[in-house]
Amino acid sequence: MANNTTSLGSPWPENFWEDLIMSFTVSVAIGLAIGGFLWALFVFLSRRRRASAPISQWSPTRRPRSSYNHGLNRTGFYRHSGYERRSNLSLASLTFQRQASMELVNSFPRKSSFRASTFHPFLQCPPLPVETESQLMTLSASTTPSTLSTAHSPSRPDFRWSSNSLRMGLSTPPPPAYESIIKAFPDS
């Protein structure tokens, strides 16, 4: 009969596991190196893109000293503007202003008013008159004479209608007085 022998040896080469561990370690190291390079490249490009958009144009190298008051018409972020003194914001707040595109600067006429091109969320403005300045607005019967006398107080500035629209910065009329709401819905 034929001699039937089985080989008890491993089907793998002698240093297979050592080579496998070495190749795995080298591939992980190469992957980490490539990943780190790509991460650094993306961080560099994102910081460069962010730095190319000007946040503030208050740098002394870009404008002469004589145009200090003209700086209020520029776009960007400004801290402690003159209009914030009338607002309810804290001292450390920022005034956010729309950023105009550099291509559109010369194509459209610019507004000369800093207040017209800036968002003021808590600016305290007097209410608008309902009709023209020569006519009184019609008030409900619940309005008291003290409310009528405060509607045209001498301390309030005179706001006029312009040719096309109202002057910039005026707010909508306030809600009705709290006393009239409380009288309309008494507690039971």
Curated annotation (Swiss-Prot):
Keywords: Membrane, Nucleus, Phosphoprotein, Transmembrane, Transmembrane helix. The keyword NADP does not apply. The chain crosses the membrane at residues 24-44. Highly expressed in lung, heart, and skeletal muscle. Expressed in brain, eye, liver, kidney, smooth muscle, pancreas, thyroid, thymus, submaxillary gland, spleen, testis, ovary, prostate, epididymis, and uterus. Deregulated expression promotes apoptosis in response to growth factor deprivation. Overexpression in synergy with CCNB1 may promote genomic instability. Pfam families: Myc_target_1. May regulate certain MYC target genes, MYC seems to be a direct upstream transcriptional activator. Does not seem to significantly affect growth cell capacity. Overexpression seems to mediate many of the known phenotypic features associated with MYC, including promotion of apoptosis, alteration of morphology, enhancement of anchorage-independent growth, tumorigenic conversion, promotion of genomic instability and inhibition of hematopoietic differentiation. Belongs to the MYCT1 family. This is Myc target protein 1. It comes from Mus musculus. The gene is Myct1.
